[in-house]
Amino acid sequence: MEKANPMYSSIYSQFPQYFGDQPWTAGPVYVGAFVMFLFVLGCFIVKGPLKWALLGATIFSVLLSWGKNFMGLTDFFIDYVPMYNKFRAVSSILVIAEFTIPLLAIFALKEILGRPEILKLKENRTGVIVSLVLTAGVSLVLAVAPSVFFSSFVTAQEMAALQQGLPAEHLTPVVTNLTEMRKAIIASDAWRSFFIIVVGCFLLFLYQQKKLKASFTMTLSLIHI
């Protein structure tokens, strides 16, 4: 909120920091930046059917959370899965992902602590690079250029409300300032996520180089998570 113009503070107090299409939503589902890195890495270094079950459940819960954006799957569950139509919000199904993502991340951490050399293996280098690109890389892009992923920072509903409640001469300054505020919020969160991932990876690197003990690394990683 550092970029907020004090002149319009009473207006901004009526809008949440979240600016998506979901009504009555204060923010997105959050599982942790370093957890996401370990989750993606786990897709490469964890072996066995449990990995595929956790990955499948994660993807499935995300698809179900799309609701009207994936009506075929949503309608099927509403029609054929008992009690599914009692959910007040389809996004509540993401509680599955909030369980499966950290669980696979923990399995990945277990593999690394049990076999420090696992990240040096040639077949796992691609996994490390992909994990960094999809987590730290995306966070860095969001931090430097938030506009890359968003065409607008003010929803159509918010714009309509502002047009009705503000004089024409104040509309453009308010929209511009609100846009800058939300860009700053995204950049701040993205920088934090980027540094969390970098610090977490550095801890794993130190453990791999035998500079840290397993118990100490696990403790720091769990705190980091």
Regions found by a protein language model. Name each.
Residues 1-38, 182-191:
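Individual transmembrane alpha-helix segments
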Residues 9-11, 15-16, 43-44, 63, ...:
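Mixed-charge, polar/low-complexity N-terminal
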Residues 34-40, 199-203:
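Hydrophobic, membrane-inserted alpha-helices
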Residues 46-223:
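Contiguous transmembrane helix-bundle modules in multi-pass membrane proteins
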